[in-house]
From Swiss-Prot:
Residues 1-21 are annotated as: Disordered. Residues 10-20 have a biased composition (Polar residues). This is Uncharacterized protein B0228.9. The lineage of its organism: Eukaryota, Metazoa, Ecdysozoa, Nematoda, Chromadorea. It comes from Caenorhabditis elegans. Signal peptide: none annotated.
Amino acid sequence: MQSVTPPPTQQGKPDPTNSDMMMKRFQEDMVGILDGRSRAHFDDLANYFHSKIRICTCFEPGRSLSVPEFQHVLTFISGYYQHLTEVRSDRWTDHPNYINGIFTYTAMGSDRKNSDGKWTYEASMDWNQNKFLIEYIWFPYNCSVFPVKDPSEPLEDVDNYLERVRTKLSSGLFLPDGVDQTLQNFEEFGDWITDDAIIVVCDEQKMDKNEFIKYMSTRYHHIRKYSNNQFDHVKNNQDFEITFSTTWTADNTTQFRDTYIFRVKKAEDYFPENDRLYLLWKIYWVTKRCTVDVTQYPAVLDGSVILGEVNKRFCGMIDGENWDVYQSFLDLFDPNDTKWGSCVGKREQKYDKIREYMNKVVARYAKCVVSEVRIRNLVHADFSTTFLLSRANEIQEQEELDVGFVGYKNKNGHWKINRMYFECEESKKRKFMDNLLNVRLKC
């Protein structure tokens, strides 16, 4: 499978207004569809379908397919094709305003066998729309080359599929120089995700597949620079797990690191044109880890990054706005060297007890607002916060809760919190602050 370039329209190429342009457009889009499984190329080609286009294939001879049916046929064929070679275009007529064209290639199938493919089409100039429109498409191929039995394995080789995902992420959506992404770009990626996929995005509410696609489109629409793309995969029983990370630069030059986990499995797809069920590789689980700020700040400002995240995620648990609230808060702590206390004077607890205690805090309160932040040392992220909390009762009486935090920067340059203390009584505040001062900072 070759790397797929954006469709001609996205490249700024004009509508075809003569037979040469139409022949080139048909080939470019068909290669993108069959060799790259690109929905964007299909949508581009469909812009030049006549309203009364006739589409005939060897799967259902004698019946014209609708445009959605045609797209499904192409999806099926591209699932079987692994790679196209010897691509050629020609025509049987030589007229600037009309073309009777032929598009041929050699394809290697998922069974590693080579076979020839041929498409013919007719198109003519529409002077009202000032572009060529395709009136007829015919796939007169011998359909017996395609699998006719329900396979026990997907049509597409898994290595080919994983490479396709890598190419789509690294060279399609998150290009080093950036690209003006549209919803359509991410909708195409959504075609590779099951409709009932589980989507977990840190700091966001639970969302379905369509909401996730819109989320990605909105988040990355105006990003102009990506760097350090990393793609890895491991086999997990019969499934595969993909980890993809990218660093993106915001308009204010702040740099963030996003990491996604995609779990892939074999999923059934019904192909009505020959009444068969086939298996495809599909993403059925998506996890987006909490975004990491990787900007190189001056030392005096460095700790403000973790300060803001701690306070936001602490309140996020109580406000209940985050689908993965607890994990996003726990991710800020060092699992191996965290000590914390629910009250000064009580026995210090370790990392594995944070979740249990925060469950009690969340059950007690319904709303959280940061009232005051007292900074002792931003270089070491040493600060305490007063949270104004509303009780989870009908009266919603308010209480203040003081919590102190201390952190450090690990060898990878990431901030981690390793000290946290809850102040329970006003009379202990001085002792509370003294304890924070005496905490041994990890540098």
